[in-house]
Amino acid sequence: MQPSTLQTLTKKALATQHVSKDDYYILERCGLWWHEAPISMYIDDDNQIIIKTLCYKEGIKLNTALVLAVKENNDDLIMLFTEWGANINYGLLFINNEHTRNLCRKLGAKEELETSEILRFFFETKHKITSSNIILCHELFSNNPFLQNVNMVDLRTIIYWELKDLTTNSMLNEIPFSEMLTKYWYGIAVKYNLKEAIQYFCQEYRHFDEWRLICALSFNNVFDLHEICNTTKVHMSINKMMELACMRDNNFLTIYYCFALGANVNRAMLISVKNFRIENMFFCMDLGANVIEHSKTLADIYGYSIIVNILSLKIYKANPILLSKETNPEKINTLLKNYYSKNMLAYDICCIDNYL
């Protein structure tokens, strides 16, 4: 970190103030100017400096702003952000000419980053879950040759963990590292329903349409699932879609949507039992699944004694309010937002009665 000077502190103070458009020329002369617009800053709840510009209205972390300045070979901003406390070493990930390399050396950068430092920057940058930041992360990391220096096992482990709810996680082993990162950012966008980011990836990577569908089903995003089914040609059977939805417990929204489109709810119950998804199993019975004896036999084969005990009770039946087969995602969300399985409630009451 460079020592603070009066000029540095003045610029920092000015960047936190509201400045009228008539006075923008002052900001430009002070170097608080980027992409033809003023730079402002604030301190977030984690006591981190956040930089805002016309291009990054939601804000980006100071270290992220630095690496973007390095990528653009913007000497003035590299020096400014370093003076404000950015880690100049992170700039090594994006240096693309010798002049910028020498400037970073002059500002205190070492010759190369360790794997732990690269992973730390990766975590810091992706922390902000917004459309603009996920797109930015994709642009920074997905095709970055410097990431070839990272221990692939470490980074792949991180990605597998964050996408652990996906039922096709193993397929990430079979693709190039840059493609895996692209799918990772796309998956995060779908997981958190970041509409602008989803549209960006949809337009840029149309050959990943099936990946988007898998993510929507696995992450219980009924809104994006509805969008996919109504705007693209789906090359997956409805029962396969239901199978993917059932692999993660509490995926009531996407399970219901597949049910409404005609998926076999008995098959869904068997899949839920096989994978020990107890809440999904109860929900399937709410939807009218009645393969209780078959499910009990399957649970016994897999050694799921708790499921065998649950299904031994003769108390389960469909919930009439779920049988209308609604496909409007807003209505589905309203119906199921705070839903508690009617059959699970019946089981709970039975257990309490037996205890008493």
Swiss-Prot record:
Stored InterPro entries: ASFV_MGF360
Source taxon at top rank: Viruses
Intervals holding ANK repeats: 61-93
GO terms (BP aspect): taxis
Keywords tagged on the record: ANK repeat
Keyword DNA damage: no
Cited function: Plays a role in virus cell tropism, and may be required for efficient virus replication in macrophages.
Family assignment from sequence similarity: Belongs to the asfivirus MGF 360 family.
Protein name: Protein MGF 360-3L
Organism for this UniProt entry: African swine fever virus (isolate Tick/South Africa/Pretoriuskop Pr4/1996) (ASFV)
